[in-house]
């Protein structure tokens, strides 16, 4: 059965649906076309839930009617099978209603800018940053998403001090938003001769991609600098000043890009990252103000929170937010993140239901 608070929401919607339908029926379209158009739009939005709820009630009635057939010995076996089928349909319809009535994250349909940075652990942390980059790339391939490296700061052994990528596709943020936080790796580094297990950390930030419709940037607030691009070890790899650094003066947020050969391409990439960073900055600022007003602390998967551990010797991945442990480390690193992400999505839905 649907939770009481959801039934109350549906009853309100049913009442609005009936009222809107009544207003439309009594309205003269020739005299008030604008009102007719507005009411028609409202009715269309309400009708989806109205039809779902009508289907839900029909299944409930069918279940009650089928239960009556259980009293007939000749029809009992057939009725039991039909009840099983109807209960499955009822659960599916409940999920549809709950999903449509649950508040959505406005960013869920957006593409993302994903940033991976080596934390504690030196070269080993940088090497695991490369492993995580590959993991997200494989996951994107499984989903049919477009994956593009925007900026990378490589180390001599093939790791990354920092790497920033864009991932584009259907509902990317709704899947990857849970990856923001500290990822911990426990393994014997290739640089370790004594065979001792080391613990290193990597931070991941997942930002919904933004543009000028999400964030207004005053050109006067930007300081744009150019310099010669350099490779691993600091040697210059370009004789022209193609690298670009853009600083947003009011917030102090600074973005550098040097992977492209032309200054224009690097500038476009830097602005793309800056828009996402500023959107994230202002949203967090707004949330902090709201939390302060409510006098409460809410965990949101911030970068300072340890969210997941990858233990190589035990072939184990543990997500600490939901106490989920999987013994298929290599599969996860090969992009098999569905079990983890679907569990996190279920937890988010559960929390939304509790607070609805």
UniProtKB/Swiss-Prot annotation:
Methylated by PrmC. Methylation increases the termination efficiency of RF1. GO terms for cellular component: cytoplasm. It holds the Pfam family PCRF. Gene3D superfamilies: 3.30.160.20, 3.30.70.1660, 6.10.140.1950. It comes from Hydrogenobaculum sp. (strain Y04AAS1). The keyword Cytoplasm applies. Keywords: Cytoplasm, Methylation, Protein biosynthesis. The modification N5-methylglutamine is found at residue 235. Belongs to the prokaryotic/mitochondrial release factor family. This is Peptide chain release factor 1.
